[in-house]
Amino acid sequence: MSNVDHAEIAKFEALAHRWWDRESEFKPLHDINPLRVNWIDERAGLAGKKVLDIGCGGGILSEAMAQRGANVTGIDMGEAPLAVARLHQLESGVAVDYRQITAEQMAEEMPGQFDVVTCLEMLEHVPDPASVIRACHRLVKPGGQVFLSTINRNPKAYLFAVIGAEYILQLLPRGTHDFRKFIRPSELGAWSREAGLEVKDIIGLTYNPLTKHYKLANDVDVNYMVQTQREA
């Protein structure tokens, strides 16, 4: 059975043409991207590395990592976002290899081929996130690093990520997130360890609605990122 939620894919298909509009529904992704790329680059040293970006969408993270000198492959199951990614690539001149394939299928094709694997803001949109994490472990080289991000599951996360972001501040379209699919750090850590990935670091991402700025912080109550590593 394919680990794909077609309703989730359809949400992003409908919005794909606005992916690179920095004032669109994707503004939060553009705003947090420099923070995420810096955090990953500081830990993995992207220059010269072979990187796989799972759930790449329209290519915001993929292009940014390629600009740091990485050899990036971006995969997604959304046809429209990938078309937008390829089109933007022609405009930007940034080289990324985009493919429409699942993480699990990619792991069958190219096990142990990547120095770094990223899977950001994607796990909460698939039926079986643990399956994706197992695929990440298979895809990364021994000693390589896997970076994951998602949203915590607690009342504060519901208030901020759903009610606040989708209804009050309208940073995201209503229905973008399903609170039931949010993932606690303890769950993400357990799935990572079960897959053979050691958790090395965790950092939160917070938003100030007054200044409209994001920053990295030790607060992992809502958005957070995790650095894991496969044994050498």
From Swiss-Prot:
Residues at which S-adenosyl-L-methionine binds: 36, 55, 76, 120
UniProt feature coiled coil, ranges: none
Keywords of this entry: Methyltransferase, S-adenosyl-L-methionine, Transferase, Ubiquinone biosynthesis
Protein's GO biological process: methylation
Functional pathway: Cofactor biosynthesis; ubiquinone biosynthesis
Domain of life: Bacteria
Keyword Methyltransferase recorded: yes
Catalytic activities: a 3-demethylubiquinol + S-adenosyl-L-methionine = a ubiquinol + S-adenosyl-L-homocysteine + H(+); a 3-(all-trans-polyprenyl)benzene-1,2-diol + S-adenosyl-L-methionine = a 2-methoxy-6-(all-trans-polyprenyl)phenol + S-adenosyl-L-homocysteine + H(+)
This enzyme's EC code(s): 2.1.1.222, 2.1.1.64
GO molecular-function term, one example from the UniProt record: polyprenyldihydroxybenzoate methyltransferase activity
Task performed by this protein: O-methyltransferase that catalyzes the 2 O-methylation steps in the ubiquinone biosynthetic pathway.
Protein family (similarity comment): Belongs to the methyltransferase superfamily. UbiG/COQ3 family.
Protein name: Ubiquinone biosynthesis O-methyltransferase
